[in-house]
């Protein structure tokens, strides 16, 4: 099994259904003997540039360990799912469990308040 980092952006019109979409991808990963090492919901964020006339999107980060065939299934689903407007899948050398810089920044802001 290999390690992957996946970030995908969900159309802002589907923000209420984010948990359902996440569960769908978690089922695909677990059904194919995959392990989720990190799952982060970054929330709705401003895009660097408009995509299909959209200025915001809901970001999700996954660090998983799975077989390449599972990645093919995820890529196909991302491609045909209208809720997912962009995605990137990167192969990494080892599992990443610590919080991402985005989450660390959010926690620091909460601590300051």
UniProtKB/Swiss-Prot annotation:
UniProt keyword Kinase present? no
Q: What UniProt keywords are attached to this protein's entry?
A: Ribonucleoprotein, Ribosomal protein, RNA-binding, rRNA-binding
Question: Which domain of life does the protein's organism represent?
Answer: Bacteria
The SS bond pairs are none
Alphabetized GO MF terms: small ribosomal subunit rRNA binding; structural constituent of ribosome
Q: Which InterPro entries match?
A: Ribosomal_bS6, Ribosomal_bS6_CS, Ribosomal_bS6_sf, Ribosomal_S6_plastid/chlpt, Transl_elong_EF1B/ribsomal_bS6
CDD domains linked: bS6
Q: Which GO BP terms apply?
A: translation
Quote the Gene3D superfamilies the UniProt record gives.
Answer: 3.30.70.60
Q: Name one Pfam family in it.
A: Ribosomal_S6
- Please provide, in alphabetical order, the Gene Ontology terms of the cellular component aspect for this entry: cytosolic small ribosomal subunit
Keyword Nucleotide-binding present in the record's keywords: the answer is no
- Summarize the protein's role: Binds together with bS18 to 16S ribosomal RNA.
Query: So what family is this one in?
Result: Belongs to the bacterial ribosomal protein bS6 family.
Protein name, per record: Small ribosomal subunit protein bS6
Annotated organism of origin: Buchnera aphidicola subsp. Schizaphis graminum (strain Sg)
